[in-house]
Regions:
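Structural scaffold elements adjacent to functional motifs in cytosolic proteins
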Residues: 22-24
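Rhodanese-like catalytic fold shared by cysteine-dependent sulfurtransferases
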Residues: 1-15, 28-66, 75-113
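Short, surface-exposed ligand- or partner-binding patches at beta-edge/loop junctions that are enriched
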Residues: 70
Length: 113
């Protein structure tokens, strides 16, 4: 079985532009509160139900291409990256999360259900 290449990068407005596939793993209330990265897929990561997360992920993105994960601060995306280690070939953990990105002036897109 192949193991994923997991890379952690500091999140910044410029860094965001590098990724075609971004998955925001926060909760709907968090998406509603702050907005999301333009073009990001929204899939909540629940550590108690990793298989459901993987199912949703494989439907939303091409798991053979790099996937950038973002949460509020970087902790959940680290856990999610570890959970999907064998399912995706390249994972980028956006460290600092949405909190850091917003502090740096990134203008989010309002979340719509």
């Amino acid at each position: 079985m192949l193991s994923a290449d997991i890379k952690t990068v500091n999140i910044s407005p410029d860094e965001i532009k590098k990724y075609d596939q971004i998955v925001d793993i926060r909760t709907p209330s968090e998406w509603q509160e702050t907005g999301i990265i333009t073009g990001a897929k929204t899939i909540t990561f629940d550590p108690s139900d990793k298989s459901a997360f993987l199912d949703e992920l494989s439907k939303a993105v091409d798991i053979k291409k790099p996937i950038a994960l973002v949460c509020r601060s970087g902790r959940r995306s680290t856990a999610a990256a570890a959970a999907i280690d064998n399912s995706v070939l390249k994972i980028i953990n956006l460290d600092g999360g949405m909190s850091s990105l917003i502090e740096q002036g990134y203008k989010t897109t309002p979340y719509k259900k």
